[in-house]
């Protein structure tokens, strides 16, 4: 989602190709042996296979809304720090929380806990 939003905001035209993760195309694996998505393959065969890197690349090409804060690099650094915190600390904790939900408990119990976490 992050990569797609970056590409959209940067008005970059790309060809989207939906793949089945259980049946990854050989063409994709030849370009990006890591086998993860998203993958952006540039005309010069450069491969970008991290969503944040794709977003930043796209906005470096065209950033009509100044989302990279070119005149205030400290703002970009703060935003990237927040993204890193979300990816490395919050998301794993959220996954643990989601897997621990007991369907026999009332939903309000979990909503209250989530409000405390956020």
Give the ranges of each region predicted by the language model.
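Acidic, glycine-rich loop-and-strand cores that form catalytic or ligand-binding grooves
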Residues: 117-118
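GST-like domain detector, emphasizing the conserved glutathione-binding G-site
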Residues: 1-114
């Amino acid at each position: 989602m992050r990569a797609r939003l970056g590409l959209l905001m940067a008005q970059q035209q790309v060809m989207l190709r939906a793949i089945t993760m259980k049946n990854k195309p050989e063409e994709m694996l030849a370009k990006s042996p890591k086998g993860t998505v998203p993958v952006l393959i540039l005309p010069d065969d450069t491969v970008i296979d991290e969503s944040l890197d794709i977003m930043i690349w796209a906005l470096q090409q065209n950033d009509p809304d100044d989302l990279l804060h070119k005149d205030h690099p400290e703002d970009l650094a703060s935003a990237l720090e927040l993204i890193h915190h979300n990816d490395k600390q919050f998301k794993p904790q959220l996954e643990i929380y989601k897997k621990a939900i007991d369907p026999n408990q009332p939903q309000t119990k979990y909503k209250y806990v989530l409000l405390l976490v956020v």
